[in-house]
């Protein structure tokens, strides 16, 4: 995967560059990302998680082949070159099947890897850190590494079988806490120690050797670690470089390896840039992008209420609230407190559990209704200034068309711009 190996090579030469990974399956987020990469003539890394997309459909209802088809079709419609599009699989392993015995969970994980690789995903994050039903808690580094090596062997064989060569790149290791933001209120976070990072690497190197996979070690481009960044419902733990100095220096001893940082959402632009400088050069972003989508939609809904008679309004916010109350499975175990606290969290939490509800047909209908209502006549500039002030500046300068769709896309791209700036390097 030349874009990624080249990025790592340049970073190791001191260019302080990186790449961001868009972790979302929402069509508007993906359109915003593709159009932004197209305009800036940069490669684009889009990742699916094992929760979103698997051989059985995941929570999006898409298999890896479906997801690839969906993204590639969108890219083609936006004239984005296919060879600049990189697809990655995140947290691939027994994650979805922790309630099953390890043998069964790992058999499913084998099939998961096959389905991702056969579909053309080239960046594979092997994560076998989670305990299954009959496993000790926590797992030892050796068991985690043995399982990852088993999956790497499946990946290599599948890639050669389907594409005639093995050109995958791998990411190993995992962060704490769980993917997708912390469940509980945070105050401070433990940074991965250099010793723990070295132990993970050595366990994986040994396990890969046992599987006859020593030759692929240069294609293991990144180790997932915790540099001390996280968010919960209303707080962000900002990157503190001094706490990660030893970890940052440790990776300089490895010729072909950088770090991958998860949960970088909501970090300041300065923190994002410093993360890349400190070798956390793959920045994952997901909830912050759907959070920006939600912000734009709530703003447009407020504009709609000013312009359209109540009986003709989409009622998007109320429809969203009703659906979330009818189907609480995606937020109930995450949001705590009294009724008002949970109501606020459903709408505004940084963890953005609302992202799981956008595909719902009732919500999608309300969204379409909102866009129709606001597309009928130009949105008054003072209302754009009131509710989308960053976009207002661009509308006034002639950079941006004040249509509902363009306002949404541009608001999401404001977040992407922070990541691009952080990753540009010298």
From Swiss-Prot:
Pathway it works in: Carbohydrate metabolism; D-tagatose 6-phosphate degradation; D-glyceraldehyde 3-phosphate and glycerone phosphate from D-tagatose 6-phosphate: step 2/2
Gene Ontology CC terms, in alphabetical order: plasma membrane
Protein's GO biological process: carbohydrate metabolic process; D-tagatose 6-phosphate catabolic process; phosphoenolpyruvate-dependent sugar phosphotransferase system
Function recorded in the entry: Component of the tagatose-1,6-bisphosphate aldolase KbaYZ that is required for full activity and stability of the Y subunit. Could have a chaperone-like function for the proper and stable folding of KbaY. When expressed alone, KbaZ does not show any aldolase activity.
Subunit organization: Forms a complex with KbaY.
Family membership: Belongs to the GatZ/KbaZ family. KbaZ subfamily.
Protein name: D-tagatose-1,6-bisphosphate aldolase subunit KbaZ
The encoding gene: kbaZ
